[in-house]
Amino acid sequence: MTGPDEIAELVASLTREVADFPEPGVQFKDLTPLFADADGLSRVTDALAQAASGATLIAGIDARGFLLGAAVAIRLGVGVLAVRKAGKLPPPVHAQTYQLEYGTAALEIPADGVELAGRRVAIVDDVLATGGTLAATARLLTTAGADVISAGVVLELSDLGGRAAVAPLPLTALRAI
């Protein structure tokens, strides 16, 4: 078993830092090297699966949450639900809008074909920044009848206030900076 400090060090060692992306002054954290490393991906999957213990369904947020969500779901022996950006799913859908810095966005899940009532759902994503997307995902799933039990992310950008935005939802971040 890998402890939290070892996982945080692993994430740090396999995170590529990109200066001034996507705009000047931003220090982008690229997790692609972590996902491309078999041992790194496996250990991160194990840690996120432990955080999602008790879930009967994993919800992965568009887009890199899909990768992690599927891996965690397989590890736990449960299904995975892709939470999509608006316009990517055929109708009917459940939708949830949320605020962006300049405007709004929406997330969607199928309204037919997946019964969420009574399902214990854990949300998985790559990075927690402001928390807007994760909080909207939790609202969307709850509105559709799910019992959202937890959220897990690989990397939390602590200064951006995401943890407070998703409170009181239990949140596990494998590395916080």
From Swiss-Prot:
GO terms for biological process: adenine salvage; AMP salvage; purine ribonucleoside salvage. It holds the Pfam family Pribosyltran. Belongs to the purine/pyrimidine phosphoribosyltransferase family. NCBIfam families: PRK02304.1-5. One of its GO terms (molecular function) is adenine binding. It catalyses: AMP + diphosphate = 5-phospho-alpha-D-ribose 1-diphosphate + adenine. Keywords: Cytoplasm, Glycosyltransferase, Purine salvage, Transferase. Catalyzes a salvage reaction resulting in the formation of AMP, that is energically less costly than de novo synthesis. Its EC number is 2.4.2.7. Disulfide bonds: none annotated. The keyword Zinc does not apply. The gene is apt. PANTHER family: ADENINE PHOSPHORIBOSYLTRANSFERASE. The keyword Transmembrane does not apply. It is an enzyme of class 2 (transferase). It is found in: Cytoplasm. This is Adenine phosphoribosyltransferase. Its main location: cytoplasm. One of its GO terms (cellular component) is cytoplasm. It comes from Mycobacteroides abscessus (strain ATCC 19977 / DSM 44196 / CCUG 20993 / CIP 104536 / JCM 13569 / NCTC 13031 / TMC 1543 / L948). It comes from the Bacteria. Homodimer. Pathway: Purine metabolism; AMP biosynthesis via salvage pathway; AMP from adenine: step 1/1.
